[in-house]
């Protein structure tokens, strides 16, 4: 399986992101972000996403700098319990690391330590907004 990689750039114009969400059929996104998102323009984008596009947003920020494995496990649980179909990371390295691991572990057996399992590719879309 080869993942499709798309690079979007812009300064506060998120129309390409809207188009991408439409193209992949997102209905509910897991937004992995730290507290600093509230100071960023993109916060307004996600606050209005459901109203504008009908895409629900579930925020996950239950992790610390230099996140622990247990934080990722919590994130995978939130992804499964809420039925999110897309993972979005906004912020710095910790948000990116946690979100990438949530995507990576999302289709693994949650009764066994993820680090002891074979990595199995999955089709869950992943979007990174550094």
Please annotate each region the language model reported.
Residues 70-130:
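Glycine/threonine-rich beta-strand-loop-alpha-helix active-site module
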């Amino acid at each position: 399986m080869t993942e499709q990689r798309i690079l979007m750039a812009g300064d506060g114009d998120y129309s390409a992101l809207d188009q991408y969400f439409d193209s992949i059929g997102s209905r509910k996104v897991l937004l992995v972000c730290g507290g600093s998102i509230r100071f960023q323009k993109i916060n307004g984008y996600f606050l209005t996403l459901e109203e504008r596009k009908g895409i629900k947003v579930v925020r996950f920020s239950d992790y610390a700098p230099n996140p622990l494995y247990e934080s990722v496990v919590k994130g995978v649980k939130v992804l499964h319990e809420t039925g999110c179909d897309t993972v979005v990371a906004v912020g710095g390295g910790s948000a990116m690391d946690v979100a990438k691991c949530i995507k990576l572990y999302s289709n693994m057996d949650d009764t066994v330590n993820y680090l002891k399992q074979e990595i199995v590719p999955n089709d869950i879309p992943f979007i990174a907004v550094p």
